[in-house]
C-alpha cells in the first residue's frame, strides 16, 4: 500500500496494555491529553474534545500522508486500505436512524440547535447540512475512517470553524473551566464526566454529515 497513516487516540498509558495498543508501519499512537507534545494542539481540551484533538493536531501541523485515518483505543477499523478521491472507509454505517432524534435522546439538543443556526446563517436556510442533521436517517458514528489527505483537509476546514463558532456562541473561549461549568449546568442530575464531551458529540454528527453529504462512504460493517 502507499503512504498510509492511521492515528489511534488514547488518553491513559494503562490503555496501551489493556487494549494491546501498538504502533506499526501504518498505526501511530497519539495521547490526546499530552500537553507537552510538539506542534500546534488543543490537547488541554481533550476531556471535552476526545479524539477530535488528534484530528486538529494532524491537520494544523500538516502531518501529510497520501491516505490518513483515525480510530481510538476502543474501536479499530477492521481493515486498512487505500481509497479513491472522494471515498471514505468508515467503521460502520447506521441506517434508518434519525440523526437529530438520536442526539436529542442522549444529549442537550439545544447545542445541536446552535449548530443548525450557524449552518443556516453560513449556508442559507434549509441547506444540505442542516437538512441532514434535522431529517437525515443515515449516521456514520465513531469518528473512525480513512480518506485521502486532500479530502481530510477539506473536512477539517469545514468542521473546525463550526465547532469554534459554537464555542464562541456559548462564551466558552476554549477555557476548560467554562466547558465543565456548562456541563454542570446542562446535566446537573446526570453523568457530567460523560456529558461534558458535548463538542466531541457534536463533531461526531458533523463528521457524519460531511461524509454523507460530500463523500462516498463505504464500510465492512453495515447496521
Describe every region a protein language model picked out.
Residues 1-223:
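ER/Golgi luminal nucleotide-sugar-dependent glycosyltransferases, focusing on the catalytic module
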Amino acid at each position: 500500500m502507499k503512504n498510509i497513516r492511521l492515528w489511534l487516540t488514547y488518553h491513559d498509558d494503562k490503555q496501551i496494555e489493556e487494549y494491546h495498543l501498538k504502533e506499526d508501519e501504518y498505526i501511530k499512537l497519539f495521547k490526546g491529553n499530552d500537553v507537552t507534545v510538539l506542534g500546534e494542539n488543543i490537547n488541554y481540551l481533550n476531556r471535552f474534545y476526545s479524539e477530535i484533538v488528534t484530528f486538529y493536531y494532524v491537520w494544523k501541523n500538516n502531518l501529510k500522508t497520501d491516505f490518513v485515518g483515525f480510530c481510538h483505543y476502543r474501536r479499530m477499523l477492521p481493515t486498512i486500505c487505500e481509497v479513491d478521491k472522494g471515498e471514505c472507509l468508515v467503521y460502520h454505517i447506521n441506517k434508518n436512524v434519525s440523526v437529530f432524534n438520536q442526539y436529542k435522546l442522549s444529549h442537550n439538543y439545544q447545542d445541536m440547535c446552535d449548530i443548525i443556526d450557524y449552518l443556516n446563517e453560513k449556508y442559507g436556510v434549509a441547506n444540505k447540512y442542516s437538512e441532514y442533521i434535522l431529517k437525515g436517517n443515515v449516521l456514520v458514528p465513531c469518528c473512525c475512517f480513512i480518506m485521502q489527505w486532500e479530502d481530510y483537509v477539506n473536512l477539517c476546514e469545514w468542521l473546525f470553524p463550526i465547532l469554534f463558532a459554537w464555542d464562541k456562541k456559548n462564551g466558552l473561549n476554549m477555557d476548560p473551566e467554562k466547558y465543565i461549568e456548562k456541563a454542570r449546568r446542562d446535566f446537573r442530575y446526570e453523568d457530567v464526566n460523560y456529558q461534558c464531551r458535548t463538542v466531541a458529540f457534536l463533531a461526531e454528527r458533523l463528521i457524519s454529515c460531511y461524509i454523507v453529504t460530500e463523500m462516498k462512504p463505504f464500510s465492512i460493517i453495515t447496521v
